[in-house]
From Swiss-Prot:
Pfam families, A to Z: Intron_maturas2, MatK_N
GO molecular function: RNA binding
Stored HAMAP family: MatK (MF_01390)
Residues that span the membrane, as ranges: none
Function: Usually encoded in the trnK tRNA gene intron. Probably assists in splicing its own and other chloroplast group II introns.
Family in the record: Belongs to the intron maturase 2 family. MatK subfamily.
Key word tRNA processing present: yes
Matching InterPro entries: Domain_X, Maturase_MatK, Maturase_MatK_N
Organism encoding this protein: Vatairea macrocarpa
Location within or outside the cell: Plastid, Chloroplast
UniProt name for this protein: Maturase K
Keyword set includes tRNA processing: yes
Disulfide feature: none
Source organism, top-level taxon: Eukaryota
Length: 509
């Protein structure tokens, strides 16, 4: 909750002079310090660069003045690579401005939820719901009794103005939104060309934090209307609504519910359930599941289609949403392939002189590691080839032995930590093997030796045993090493409550 306190202090300083307007905060130097000092989206191998002297208040003010002096409507697409506003270093300057906008617009929503949590007296318990893995126990408990499932991908808003207008219902500051529009148009002109059109809200590493914020606000509006339709279409009371969240960037309160969002839309988890339907969302993807006839699923399917078309002007066709039998369909969700498998058991029962064979069908929730996509990601990161054969990483060969081993171990631990919930660990062990051998080959390359010769010089492989023994060591701290519980947990699924983000290797489809 430290970020809320920082936001509260800075906002209170301006309230007495600016009457809650966000526009003056754009010219506050500490805003850009917050933007660079609280960067939680960096990759696992990147260090926090912090707030450097490049992102100074003077640069920000000059860029904003240029925005006002320039008519963005007359910029031709052919000049998009030489953006007049962004100057000679458009990537740096646009990042500075966008981070400042994001921090400013997130402040009131952070404060709003902070006050809501304090009133509800759940500030101390909110951390229990931060883990991405918190959703899978819900799957294990409920999905075994369901029959139909539908994967729904939430479409991107067709125009930035839709998201900006949605935001204006929450924040009343015309000068701020005028400046925000100027920046958004400038940025779009700099990245979109006739030869290479792209979606502004698509998941790209170069996308500023402000676009992720606008996308989440768009999803907020969509889910609030969806929840309203659910309440109006059913006479039954909503039995439960839960929100699971991780890194917190901004919040919103919808009537009596607290909806939680993050700066990265890949981090929001929410679900509600009643006697008929279950709804789960993670990233820009949601899942509808039901144990009843497909009629109810079709009803909600067309509800969503009409909602996107009529309220958000987003064209979507019914054919894009498919309704499948849960035990025949494997859906990709939160980095796992999940499905419900039917296990058939035969029991012999004897009554007097007659014996009977009774077939019992058991449903069990299974999770699988997406081995193909993970190998593709490892190949892109130069840890193996496209066939999954380990190779040396030439980029890291110039580092010290300790740094090389530490980097490989961090990746291996993160992947192992995230995928310990898989039903079968064979794929996870294969990923560990690729990283382990890639580490050895990288060390051998650095010392200009072969793998066999390097291992002989090393004398043993004890230095690299952590690739395979970490989970057992962690569990042995809780249970005796010889206990049956430890062996059962090590072989079974383990869901962690400290998974607060997923990196690109984990979260790639």
């Amino acid at each position: 909750m430290e970020e809320y306190q920082v936001f509260x202090v800075y906002l209170e300083l301006d309230r007495s002079r600016q009457q809650d307007f966000l526009y003056p905060l754009i010219f506050r130097e500490y805003i850009y310090g917050l933007a660079y000092g609280h960067d939680l989206n960096r990759p696992i191998l990147m260090e926090n660069i912090g707030y450097d002297n490049k992102s100074s208040l003077l640069i920000a003010k000059r860029l904003i003045i240029r925005m006002y002096q320039q008519n963005h409507f007359i910029i031709s697409a052919n000049d998009s690579n030489k953006n007049q506003f962004l100057g000679y270093n458009n990537n740096l300057y646009s990042q500075i401005i966008s981070e400042g906008f994001a921090v400013v617009v997130e402040i009131p929503f952070s404060l709003q939820l902070s006050y809501s949590l304090e009133e509800a007296e759940i500030v101390k318990s909110y951390k229990n719901f931060r883990s991405i893995h918190s959703i899978f126990p819900f799957f294990e408990e409920k999905f075994s009794y369901l029959k139909y499932v539908s994967d729904v991908r939430i479409p991107y808003p067709i125009h930035l103005e839709i998201s900006v207008q949605t935001l204006r219902y929450w924040v009343k500051d015309a000068p701020f939104f005028h400046l925000l529009r100027l920046f958004l148009y400038e940025y779009c002109n700099s990245i979109i060309t006739p030869k290479k059109p792209i979606s502004t809200f698509s998941k790209r590493k170069s996308n500023p934090r402000i676009f992720l914020f606008l996308y989440n606000f768009y999803v907020c509006e969509y889910e609030s209307i969806f929840l309203f339709l659910r309440n109006k279409s059913s006479h039954l009371r909503l039995t439960s609504f839960s929100v699971l969240f991780e890194r917190i960037y901004f919040y919103a309160k919808i009537e009596h519910l607290v909806e939680v969002f993050t700066g990265d839309y890949s981090s929001t988890l929410s679900f509600f359930k009643d006697l008929f339907i279950h709804y789960v969302r993670y990233q820009g993807k949601s899942i509808l599941a039901s144990k009843n006839v497909p009629l109810l699923m079709n009803k909600w399917k067309y509800y969503l289609i009409h909602l996107w078309q009529c309220h958000f002007d987003v064209w979507s066709q019914p054919g894009t949403i498919h309704i499948n039998l849960l035990y025949k369909h494997s859906h990709f969700f939160x980095g796992y392939f999940s499905n419900v498998q039917l296990n058939l058991s035969v029991v012999r029962s004897q009554m007097l002189e007659n014996s009977f064979l009774i077939e019992i069908v058991m449903k069990k929730f299974h999770t699988k590691v997406p081995i193909i996509s993970l190998i593709r990601s490892l190949a892109k990161a130069k840890f193996c080839n496209v066939l999954g054969h380990p190779i040396s990483n030439p980029v890291w060969a110039d580092s010290s032995d300790f740094d090389i081993i530490d980097r490989f171990l961090r990746i291996c631990r993160n992947l192992s930590h995230y995928y310990n919930g898989s039903s079968k660990k064979x794929s996870l062990y294969r990923i560990k093997y690729i990283l382990r051998l890639s580490c050895i080959k990288t060390l051998a390359r650095k010392h200009k030796s072969t793998v066999c010769a390097f291992l002989k010089i090393l004398g043993s492989e004890e230095l690299l045993e952590e690739f395979f023994t970490e989970e057992e060591e962690i569990l042995s701290l809780i249970f005796p090493r010889t206990s049956y519980t430890l062996k059962r947990l090590y072989r079974g699924r383990i869901w962690y409550l400290d998974i607060i983000f997923s990196n690109d290797l984990v979260n790639r489809e």
